[in-house]
Amino acid sequence: MARVYMETMIQKCVSFSQIKQLQSHFLTAGHFQSSFLRSRLLERCAISPFGDLSFAVQIFRYIPKPLTNDWNAIIRGFAGSSHPSLAFSWYRSMLQQSSSSSAICRVDALTCSFTLKACARALCSSAMDQLHCQINRRGLSADSLLCTTLLDAYSKNGDLISAYKLFDEMPVRDVASWNALIAGLVSGNRASEAMELYKRMETEGIRRSEVTVVAALGACSHLGDVKEGENIFHGYSNDNVIVSNAAIDMYSKCGFVDKAYQVFEQFTGKKSVVTWNTMITGFAVHGEAHRALEIFDKLEDNGIKPDDVSYLAALTACRHAGLVEYGLSVFNNMACKGVERNMKHYGCVVDLLSRAGRLREAHDIICSMSMIPDPVLWQSLLGASEIYSDVEMAEIASREIKEMGVNNDGDFVLLSNVYAAQGRWKDVGRVRDDMESKQVKKIPGLSYIEAKGTIHEFYNSDKSHEQWREIYEKIDEIRFKIREDGYVAQTGLVLHDIGEEEKENALCYHSEKLAVAYGLMMMDGADEESPVRVINNLRICGDCHVVFKHISKIYKREIIVRDRVRFHRFKDGSCSCRDFW
């Protein structure tokens, strides 16, 4: 009876002071000798929201010979803490303690599970193989729940080869195993493989869960495959908040922001802050700042407290629309509302000021930050320095980027263009030499387009497509027509020391141009209202931006491009970004 009473008392602890009082009572009443009650108290202290992990460690130090449950409580606490890597340190200490013949603690499935979750959170890939070996050595590989946790940890650490191997070796695969690998493939930018696995799961008769649907919709978002996304979302009720959030995100990222808003409006359950944030972000990246900010302003009226993501979405809307004063007001309001600013908030404001030509203010904000600025902030300043031909600021930003050890090909191009605009050709040559000496590699451009139910991929100068000859002929046709319309190639974007004609040729076979050309081919005779939709893995280049404006006017076809920053809607010779990107 005493044990039941004390366990009830532990469960009733709702503050740290109550936990401390109970611990004192344990010591004086002798309950500390009960391993069951002791481990329950440790768990309450280590993992409850009102507990204190450091105090749990102090309690642990009082134990002369900690048992398995005592160790597990501490490891579990660190796994869910802000320092998950410490869980692996405790695991190694436990492993050392359990190796002696007189040990009374043993690493069990729960120990491994908690440590794996810590490794997944800390992205501690070096520990994964060690844990995998221990699982096999201790005969725990038949534990399907533990194997799924291991699979999830491999996936989150980006080791998809090991994840696939483990998945194929598992004697029993439940829906959680499939979900872990599908989600891992999506986060590892292997969305096509994720969709193949999702379809294989359906073929094998595995009933999908809510988590499956969210992961699959994420894959569709990456691929821009709205048709498959609609098929997956079809049949779900309008009150499932997690799936509806994923559907809003999917529609937005596939370029159908009005359909996203339809899901948002028709949702019958209680909208979470994530629901609102997803919709605000959707409008923001589509350049519909006023609709985004209108929803942002409704948050508190609907009983939702804006969080850091809400403010980031609002700042993103201001950033894409050039709403400088409103953006600064949103940024300054964060402190009044008790919302802590992070690097992304500063990044939005720096980009907003920079693109408005207020480079000194942007520079001052970077220098006054309480945290160390990341390279993205300086890259925003460098990009704006090119727009406004500010050599001094470009050199400052470039120097800061280099000191951080970042060698991005785009940064070299921007600095070179600033020098070229001032006729400083020796400096242009120096930048090129610096780029070559550092062996800077360009990230290959990759674009997707969906045509007749199939996703097609294109790389720069790609000739792997079965219709590449027809696509290149279409490119030649486009080049002829846009030249007649006044197009001049932006050859300054090409850093290589080659002739102007070769530079123009290098520009005309960018992946997004190949995708648009293919889209135009596939839409011959199609409804004029149907746009060409392309997804690009990089920020759209200035030349492609100009070309697509000409194409939209000449071919009377809307072109929608999602790059890594935002959506661009080209129609009748202009872009929704108003050349502010």
From Swiss-Prot:
<dbReference type="Pfam" id="PF14432">
    <property type="entry name" value="DYW_deaminase"/>
</dbReference>
<dbReference type="InterPro" id="IPR032867">
    <property type="entry name" value="DYW_dom"/>
</dbReference>
<keyword id="KW-0677">Repeat</keyword>
<dbReference type="Pfam" id="PF13041">
    <property type="entry name" value="PPR_2"/>
</dbReference>
<feature type="repeat" description="PPR 9">
    <location>
        <begin position="342"/>
        <end position="372"/>
    </location>
</feature>
<feature type="region of interest" description="Type E motif">
    <location>
        <begin position="377"/>
        <end position="452"/>
    </location>
</feature>
<feature type="repeat" description="PPR 7">
    <location>
        <begin position="272"/>
        <end position="306"/>
    </location>
</feature>
<feature type="repeat" description="PPR 5">
    <location>
        <begin position="209"/>
        <end position="239"/>
    </location>
</feature>
<dbReference type="InterPro" id="IPR046848">
    <property type="entry name" value="E_motif"/>
</dbReference>
<feature type="repeat" description="PPR 8">
    <location>
        <begin position="307"/>
        <end position="341"/>
    </location>
</feature>
<dbReference type="GO" id="GO:0008270">
    <property type="term" value="F:zinc ion binding"/>
</dbReference>
<feature type="repeat" description="PPR 2">
    <location>
        <begin position="108"/>
        <end position="142"/>
    </location>
</feature>
<dbReference type="GO" id="GO:0003723">
    <property type="term" value="F:RNA binding"/>
</dbReference>
<dbReference type="InterPro" id="IPR002885">
    <property type="entry name" value="Pentatricopeptide_rpt"/>
</dbReference>
<feature type="repeat" description="PPR 1">
    <location>
        <begin position="67"/>
        <end position="101"/>
    </location>
</feature>
<feature type="repeat" description="PPR 6">
    <location>
        <begin position="240"/>
        <end position="270"/>
    </location>
</feature>
<dbReference type="InterPro" id="IPR011990">
    <property type="entry name" value="TPR-like_helical_dom_sf"/>
</dbReference>
<feature type="region of interest" description="Type DYW motif">
    <location>
        <begin position="484"/>
        <end position="581"/>
    </location>
</feature>
<dbReference type="Pfam" id="PF20431">
    <property type="entry name" value="E_motif"/>
</dbReference>
<comment type="similarity">
    <text>Belongs to the PPR family. PCMP-H subfamily.</text>
</comment>
<dbReference type="Pfam" id="PF01535">
    <property type="entry name" value="PPR"/>
</dbReference>
<feature type="region of interest" description="Type E(+) motif">
    <location>
        <begin position="453"/>
        <end position="483"/>
    </location>
</feature>
<dbReference type="InterPro" id="IPR046960">
    <property type="entry name" value="PPR_At4g14850-like_plant"/>
</dbReference>
<feature type="repeat" description="PPR 3">
    <location>
        <begin position="143"/>
        <end position="173"/>
    </location>
</feature>
<dbReference type="GO" id="GO:0009451">
    <property type="term" value="P:RNA modification"/>
</dbReference>
<feature type="repeat" description="PPR 4">
    <location>
        <begin position="174"/>
        <end position="208"/>
    </location>
</feature>
<protein>
    <recommendedName>
        <fullName>Pentatricopeptide repeat-containing protein At1g34160</fullName>
    </recommendedName>
</protein>
